[in-house]
């Protein structure tokens, strides 16, 4: 028996990392929002690694925060350890990574959602969507509740027709033995969506009290207080270490001897797994020349003894898992608390989406997270906030918001998905971004806070602080550009200590700062200090902008050229069959993706420069024909 459950502006299906960002963004923009989840005890659940951030991913978390999202704030309040990675490399690849207290992370996020105005969190399983005249107008749950809305965001993670595989055992399930969503997957097929089958996996968890840590290497957090969120002022100083160990020759022998029992090699697993997070059995086969592989032992929280065995993702039978664990130094007497497993799930082919993450087939229907073929909490959250923003914009009758590839890693991620698609769970890497020196960890606020403020996601107080920081950066750059450093014993002694060549003549202060060895702390010892003491973030920005000025300027020139191509718009209903001379493969791909600009068309796989030249001529002819008529 069905009944009317209520009417909303936006409905979000799922409360994982994509869902919570989507729901919070829509509600904060003023949309009356309903968030439905299979289990209220699994809001923002971390079914795999208990961590947030890392290369590229950490920058996404900063971008989410700069837009007004929650992931950064939440991990700042609930982490057990934080480290800045790649500190010995340039600023383009530096990234923050935090070990999460996964249980506190969930609790804190759930509390935030429950206290958010305009947002109702409810437990419920969505079986069908309400479609009227090609538009999504709500959802129907398995209890018969009908909820109406102007826009719906689907963020179902790995629950769509989820199947856990552990050795010879397999059964329908979401992650961690939670209830899967079967009917919604079937319904999406009925609606004509192309689905693919992907797979991911997780390692065993072991009892921390049974680890011999003396045989491992300690991995402490950074002494310097760090944070993902630009709003964080209180820092956690009581950190817990992680530990490093390695597989052994015996580990590899046990795995090799049991490959016949591995679902990956027996044919039980049909889904495509993530290239950049292979299972341990896959590593042993693909990298047979390596005598050992790194294993990180990561605590899952402050109030549990469970330890996550990072690097040992597996779907081998339980008895094999226990045997191979005991061959790893430090784990000889270990007790396994949960076995690792593989999980298969349905995802949609993401080229069926516009860059707003709205589906091309059904207006008002958005998808975000692992349903779009990505892997990782951060990639999911980045899509989630954009889908939530655009669902709210749709509900309000406003234009969608698209981040381009020069604005954010989130823009790179979404553009890759909707333009190129993916044949495997997509992981964001710094190498996927053309403009890495622009898309840095340290400047996410300078890139995106203005946009977050315009959307109503950034408070007046935070925006005022941001504008003050912007102004301080410009003033300090102007101040030092007028200074000259003269050679002296004091100056040359400092340069000698830093391993930098001594000065024989006066130099512009900016030329001295550009030296690789010169940090701003040292720089302030040889120039007058500013009248007002500035924040470390201001000094950091000035140093990076001055040091890498030439490289940054080159990237901006590239961006300007790209923008010219992005500004050449393509009508959504363009008839590609009417364009003579385009290669058959290019025509098929362009009809499938339906790019919105010539820039996007140039990134579609199978489309070459000759095809783009023909497309440009055709569009120009059409424009001239319209003008003359």
Swiss-Prot record:
SMART domains: GIDA_assoc_3
One Pfam family of this chain: SAM_GIDA_C
Cofactor entry: FAD
Main location: cytoplasm
PROSITE patterns, sorted: GIDA_1, GIDA_2
Positions of FAD binding: 14-19, 126, 181, 370
Domain of life of the organism encoding this protein: Bacteria
InterPro entries listed in its UniProt record: FAD/NAD-bd_sf, GIDA_C_N, MnmG, MnmG-rel, MnmG-rel_CS, MnmG_C, MnmG_C_subdom, MnmG_C_subdom_sf
GO BP annotations listed: tRNA methylation; tRNA wobble uridine modification
Binding site residues for NAD(+): 273-287
GO molecular function: flavin adenine dinucleotide binding
Cellular component, GO annotation: cytosol
Localization terms from the record: Cytoplasm
Keywords attached to this entry: Cytoplasm, FAD, Flavoprotein, NAD, tRNA processing
HAMAP family, per database record: MnmG_GidA (MF_00129)
Subunit structure as annotated in this protein's UniProt entry: Homodimer. Heterotetramer of two MnmE and two MnmG subunits.
Family: Belongs to the MnmG family.
Function: NAD-binding protein involved in the addition of a carboxymethylaminomethyl (cmnm) group at the wobble position (U34) of certain tRNAs, forming tRNA-cmnm(5)s(2)U34.
Listed name of the protein: tRNA uridine 5-carboxymethylaminomethyl modification enzyme MnmG
Gene this protein is translated from: mnmG
């Amino acid at each position: 028996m069905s009944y009317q459950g209520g009417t909303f502006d936006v409905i979000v299906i799922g409360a994982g990392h994509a869902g919570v960002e989507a729901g919070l963004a829509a509600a904060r923009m003023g949309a009356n929002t309903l968030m439905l989840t299979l289990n209220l005890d699994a809001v923002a659940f971390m079914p795999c690694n208990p961590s947030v951030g890392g290369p590229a991913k950490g920058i996404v978390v900063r971008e989410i925060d700069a837009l007004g999202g929650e992931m950064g704030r939440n991990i700042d309040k609930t982490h057990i350890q934080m480290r800045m990675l790649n500190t010995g490399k340039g600023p383009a690849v530096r990234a923050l990574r935090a070990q999460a207290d996964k249980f506190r992370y969930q609790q804190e996020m759930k509390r935030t959602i429950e206290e958010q105005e305009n947002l109702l969190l409810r437990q419920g399983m969505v079986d069908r969507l309400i479609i009227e005249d090609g538009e999504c107008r709500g959802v129907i749950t398995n209890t018969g509740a009908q909820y109406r809305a102007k826009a719906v965001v689907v963020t179902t993670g790995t629950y769509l027709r989820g199947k856990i595989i552990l050795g010879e055992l397999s059964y329908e399930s979401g992650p961690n033995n939670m209830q899967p969503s079967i009917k919604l997957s079937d319904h999406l097929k009925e609606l004509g969506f192309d689905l693919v089958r992907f797979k991911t996996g997780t390692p065993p968890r072991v009892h921390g009290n049974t680890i011999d840590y003396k045989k491992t290497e300690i991995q402490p957090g950074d002494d310097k207080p760090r944070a993902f969120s630009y709003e964080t002022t209180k820092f956690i100083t009581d950190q817990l270490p992680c530990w490093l160990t390695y597989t052994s020759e015996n580990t590899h022998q046990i795995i090799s001897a049991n490959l016949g029992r591995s679902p990956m090699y027996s044919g039980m697993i049909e889904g495509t797994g993530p290239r950049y997070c292979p299972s341990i059995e896959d590593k042993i086969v693909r990298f047979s020349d390596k005598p050992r592989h790194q294993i990180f032992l990561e605590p899952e929280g402050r109030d549990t003894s469970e330890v996550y065995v990072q690097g040992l993702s597996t779907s081998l039978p339980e008895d094999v898992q226990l045997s191979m664990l005991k061959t790893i130094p430090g784990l000889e007497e270990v007790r396994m608390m949960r076995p690792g497993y593989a999980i298969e799930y349905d995802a949609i082919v993401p080229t069926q989406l516009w860059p707003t993450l709205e589906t091309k087939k059904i207006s008002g229907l958005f998808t975000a997270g692992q349903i779009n073929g990505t892997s990782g909490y951060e990639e999911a959250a980045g899509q989630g906030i954009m889908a939530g923003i655009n669902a709210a914009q749709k509900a309000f009758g406003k234009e969608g918001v698209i981040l381009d590839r020069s604005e954010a890693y989130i823009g790179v991620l979404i553009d890759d998905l909707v333009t190129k698609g993916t044949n495997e769970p997509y992981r964001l890497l710094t190498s996927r971004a053309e403009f890495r020196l622009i898309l840095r960890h340290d400047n996410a606020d300078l890139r995106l806070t203005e946009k977050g403020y315009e959307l109503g996601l950034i408070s007046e107080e935070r925006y005022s602080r941001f504008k003050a920081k912007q102004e301080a950066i410009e003033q300090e750059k102007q101040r030092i550009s007028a200074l000259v450093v003269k050679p002296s014993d004091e100056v040359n002694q400092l340069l000698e200590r830093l391993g930098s060549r001594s000065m024989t003549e006066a130099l512009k202060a900016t030329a001295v700062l550009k030296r690789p060895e010169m940090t701003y702390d040292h720089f302030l010892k040889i120039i007058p200090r500013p009248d007002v003491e500035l924040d470390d973030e201001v000094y950091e920005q000035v140093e990076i902008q001055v040091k890498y000025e030439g490289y940054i300027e080159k990237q901006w020139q590239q961006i300007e050229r790209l923008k010219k191509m992005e500004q050449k718009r393509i009508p959504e209903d363009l008839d590609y069959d009417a364009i003579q001379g385009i290669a058959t493969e290019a025509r098929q791909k362009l009809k499938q993706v339906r790019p919105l600009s010539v820039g996007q068309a140039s990134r579609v796989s199978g489309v070459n420069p000759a095809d783009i030249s023909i497309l440009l001529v055709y569009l120009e002819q059409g424009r001239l024909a319209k003008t003359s008529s």
